[in-house]
Amino acid sequence: MKNIFKLFLSSIAALAIFFSSAQAGSIKIGTEGAYPPWNAKDESGKLIGFEVELANFLCIYMKADCTIVEQDWDGMIPGLIMRKYDAIMAGMSITDERMKTINFSQGYADEVASLAVMKGSSLEGLDTPKAINLSTGGSDVKNALKTLTAALAGKTIGVQTATIHQNFLESGDVGSVKVRTYKTQDEVNLDLAAGRIDAALAAAVAFTDYAEKSGKDVVLVGPTFAGGAFGNGVGVGIRKDDTQLLKDFNKAINTARKNGKISELAIKWFGFDASM
């Protein structure tokens, strides 16, 4: 009887190891599917974009069976915490605030932000540097923010909700602007084109992609933004306790960087090399 019981326990242990290994080789990745060209859907509803293709290559490098699932942006981090998926690849910038809740892999791409207006706007021709990094500070940054504060006074600026762009506008760095939030970037773009907002703030490539596909006269104005509230590049979001998965993603990202895959995909989807 004891031998039978030992055999039973051994079988249970073997099954536990088997299922643990199977789960370790299976990864579910959450993305929004509504932030082109980072992630989007084609006419058939298939997920496409820079991060969708990159995720597939990272999974090959990790020898993992991956599934990419959709999640609304404002529920992205809660969904990860609730274990609806194991990782986030959704144009999510690495910020100190987010790292209080989740971990991030090393960055795989830069995401510079920009203000956008419709052609003919009074905001065209803002006299600012081409780019500012809020982490470095200095007179150029201070002067640029001062110029923006004066120019944006009384203006309504559209942003996607729960983003670094909303956080920046509400930080007071550019005065007390009127911020209008939207569930998706597509809604921001549509209201900008319709003249229901004066300007919008998002990743520069989100506007250039929209302009190219819609034919609308969207114009980028002012400086591009990085650092500070805008974070330190885009990375894979992972739960705090998934330390091995974090190591696996970092190793795969290193491989993709060294063999040029990130650069290749960035040029394909963004039109320039945004790899980090």
Name each region found by the language model.
Residues 59-70, 151-156, 171-184, 196:
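A local structural motif
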Residues 9-18:
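Bacterial N-terminal signal peptides
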Residues 64, 93, 104-157, 162:
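A conserved helix-loop-strand patch within extracytoplasmic ligand-binding domains
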Residues 75-78, 91-101, 167-172, 186, ...:
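A ligand-binding cleft/hinge motif common to bilobed small-molecule-binding domains
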Residues 52, 67-78, 141-145, 179-194, ...:
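Short helix-initiation/N-cap motifs at beta->coil->alpha
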Residues 24-94, 100, 259:
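Extracytoplasmic small-molecule ligand-binding "clamshell" domains
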Residues 33, 110-114, 208, 212-251, 253-269, ...:
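Periplasmic-binding protein-like
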